[in-house]
From Swiss-Prot:
Belongs to the AIM39 family. It is found in: Mitochondrion membrane. Keywords: Membrane, Mitochondrion, Transit peptide, Transmembrane, Transmembrane helix. The chain crosses the membrane at residues 156-176. It comes from the Eukaryota. One of its GO terms (cellular component) is mitochondrial membrane. This is Altered inheritance of mitochondria protein 39, mitochondrial. The keyword Membrane applies. It is a single-pass membrane protein. It comes from Saccharomyces cerevisiae (strain RM11-1a) (Baker's yeast).
Amino acid sequence: MWGLCKNHFPSNKIQVQERNKALKPKKSGSEHKTKQLFPVFNCKKKEKGVMIRFAILRNANTSLLSARSICLFTQAPTYCHVRLNTLNKSITTKRNSLTESKRHVHDGKHFFTTPHQQQQTKLGEIEEGHSPNIKGEDLRSIGQAITHQRNKRRKQIWSAIFGGIFGVILGYSLIYRVIYLKEQSFLPLFPSSKIRKLSTRDLKKVDVNQVQKLSKLRVLEILSGHDMIKEQYGVPLLDKDGNSPTLNEFSMWCEDQDPCVTGIVMEPDDKRDSSHTWYRIPFVCKWRITHRPISIRGTIDDLLNRIGLETSDLFEIISPERVYGSFKYEYPLQGDSHALHLWFHGEIELDDDSLIVYNGKYHVDVKLQEIDLFRREKNGQLIQYVLYKNEAGDK
């Protein structure tokens, strides 16, 4: 074995130096550039070889290639070699870092933020629902679902509010007033007009035939003294057949003094006879729909009486119209605590082209408000002539 390796392991110092020169690596282009960039690290000391001997047993079987590889790798590195290798590694790492940073910079916004931070921001936007990949149809469907849910919630709230109010009112009117206290209760529904027709019950208390006769006499009396009627129709006033004029149309209605409402009247089911038509709920109550006025002054009086006061203690209302024809002296229907105006309307036909129309109020006597003559002239025009009008009357 020693004979095979004697060329690689010289015996004297001169041979060692020559061997080191032969094994000294040649300068490459990269190393030459490195020495130019870093001249401080130029090695001036001579390289020294290292003599290593291997003791191999005689009986051991070792191939020639193994022995040659051992001889080649026994050359120990010098200080300059180690330093050059370190510098080469540092330069390559710097170049790699610069190339990687250049690859990451796509536009100017990465000078102050790294791509990693931008990726985290995009992920956060996607989690919040601001992803650009979401379609417009999906956004509209989401918006419609939110709007539908809000409307549904709003309807539930309003239904609960109105249901609670209706339950409180119905419970007080029906359960407390009618069933518990055994009293009459009125539940208002909606406002109604002051003017209404006389009911069957009201007509029983008013003599309509008497009002009709009195109104006709008052109209003929006023027309007989009118100059136009005297000249064109003559006195006494007669119809086309030469008879006294007759009423073709006559009607009456009432007008309440206060605002009116339409509502439901409820009473205990006592099965007593009544002039009104009632609808019954067996063993609970009876009810009907009616009109009732709302007396503001009466409501104020009731509130003051509950706290021990009266209206006269605070103020006094003085009406300047304390004369016949005001509401104070109008016809009160039986069973009502408020005054009413009883109005009437009539038509008297004089001939085919002439018609007398009048209206007024009734209390104890008839009080006419207006008398008009409707006549069709020869040219075919229908003209209204106002023959009488009560300017001081309340309409």
